[in-house]
């Protein structure tokens, strides 16, 4: 199957491989179809467009007058998705713009697309970004220390590793990688500078984390650097807050996360409308909860999907429906 195939029609509906391409294999696409779409003639946004797999899945369950807008900061992803969905672009059912989902409100205002009926977030890094050594996301291959999702702008991992002080590096590894060896690794990175490639970075980390902890430690370190380079958690908090403003009452948000830092923020915001996980009351004593989880708790991939796409193993899909502001006083469950 080539990157520009809309889907593999030889694969039955509901099969996790149906919307996969060499660029990226979207996870939980059947669940997204079933739970995000509330109006088949509605307006939907895939704010993490990638190779267009989820956008294709949404278009397949929308009526001819339903539309999907794709947003991505990666120019390669935009080009791939536009080529893949060329027929839908021609029909006016799909279009894509370059941008970050942290600017969701401004993007939608520019496209005259407020309110929307549904918002999809498939967080983290794509398969393509990991698999291309030149992007600098993988510790397994030699590549430049880049890690930018938009390679045309912003801070690189090389600038962080070589330019930040030991204390700042330690804090990054501890906060964004939840790495217990953060202090030791930060000190070793500073001693080994300058570091210019992914393998040079990986070798320093490997010296600090012998087997059996090596791979997990490398994963956490590269995750931490990627998060800070792309301001991923800041962007996530911004898009969740803006979703409350742009999704219509009765519309939905679907967010797929891959690690606890993402999932914790999504869970707390969709359950409580804040990132502290604290029930809050307005001036009249009413509990403020702009979203209602549906269902309560995460949806995870089944065995067949994990077998077909191992990346799905860590995926957590959370879906919530925008409440009417007058209904926001419903009882709230405790945060588990």
Swiss-Prot record:
Q: What is its EC number?
A: 2.1.1.199
Query: A GO biological process this protein is involved in?
Result: rRNA base methylation
Where does this polypeptide localize?
Cytoplasm
Residues reported in the UniProt entry to bind S-adenosyl-L-methionine = 52-54, 72, 101, 122, 129
Q: Which reaction does it catalyse?
A: cytidine(1402) in 16S rRNA + S-adenosyl-L-methionine = N(4)-methylcytidine(1402) in 16S rRNA + S-adenosyl-L-homocysteine + H(+)
Q: What class of enzyme is it?
A: transferase
* UniProt keyword list: Cytoplasm, Methyltransferase, rRNA processing, S-adenosyl-L-methionine, Transferase
Write one Gene Ontology MF term.
rRNA (cytosine-N4-)-methyltransferase activity
Region annotated Disordered, chain positions: 294-336
Pfam families linked to this entry: Methyltransf_5
Q: Which GO terms describe its cellular component?
A: cytoplasm
Query: InterPro entries per the record?
Result: RsmH, SAM-dep_MeTrfase_MraW_recog, SAM-dependent_MTases_sf
* HAMAP family, A to Z: 16SrRNA_methyltr_H (MF_01007)
Q: Which family does it belong to?
A: Belongs to the methyltransferase superfamily. RsmH family.
Describe the function of this protein: Specifically methylates the N4 position of cytidine in position 1402 (C1402) of 16S rRNA.
Q: In its UniProt entry, what is this protein called? A: Ribosomal RNA small subunit methyltransferase H
Taxonomic lineage of the native organism: Bacteria, Pseudomonadati, Rhodothermota, Rhodothermia, Rhodothermales
| Gene assigned in the entry | rsmH
